[in-house]
Amino acid sequence: MGRGKIEIKRIENSSNRQVTYSKRRNGIMKKAKEITVLCDAHVSLVIFASSGKMHEYCSPSTTLIDILDRYHKQSGKRLWDAKHENLNNELDRIKKENDSMQIELRHLKGEDISSLHHKELMAIEDALEIGLASVRNKQMEFYKMVKKNQRILEEENKHLNYIVHHQGMPMEAGNVREVESGYHQRAVRDYNPQMPFAFRVQPIQPNLQERI
């Protein structure tokens, strides 16, 4: 006599259900491996037990992502919602932008330019000239800042030397002010000959009142 037909329905006993799941799962995994080898098929299998534990198999010649992409293209079904699609598109855009920037960087370094047209080479030259001008401007700003700091340090050094030169004098509060005042007067005197003639103080003419 043949074996009777088994009714397919949920197994109520949890222990029996777990044993049956384990046997059937191993059988499905075995069949998936066999059809992969015998028929050169691409198979991806994912099984979740009632406990939440996952078991999976994928043909060695492919990946789950590749199979899902092929399914999406051939079936026309949407596997992702609009939010995920927007994120995927944004990732693609960023990747393309990054690739383009990498190419531009190689061109600016003089790499891979043999196949470029004249206009493309001119654009690279313009970009390099703009960058060089920016670097030179920064260098000039730095140079001016260094010269300014140098002048300040030289002035402070002169001030300190003047005070040290007069250190034999009693350094009371009044004398310190006199020393500093003498330094400033000397600085004005040293600077005065360098002033243009038109800005120098002219002596008062003694006979001016008599002429009036």
Swiss-Prot record:
Chief localization: nucleus
Keyword line: DNA-binding, Flowering, Nucleus, Transcription, Transcription regulation
GO cellular component: nucleus
Residue span, MADS-box domain: 1-61
Effect of a null allele: Abnormal petal and stamen structures.
Cellular localization per UniProt: Nucleus
Tissue specificity comment: Expressed during flower development in stamens and petals.
Organism domain of life: Eukaryota
One GO MF term attached to the UniProt entry: DNA-binding transcription factor activity, RNA polymerase II-specific
Signal peptide positions on this chain: none
General remark: Over-expression of PI in flowers prevents fruit development leading to non-fleshy berries.
Function: Probable transcription factor that may play role in specifying stamen and petal organ identity.
Full protein name: Agamous-like MADS-box protein MADS9
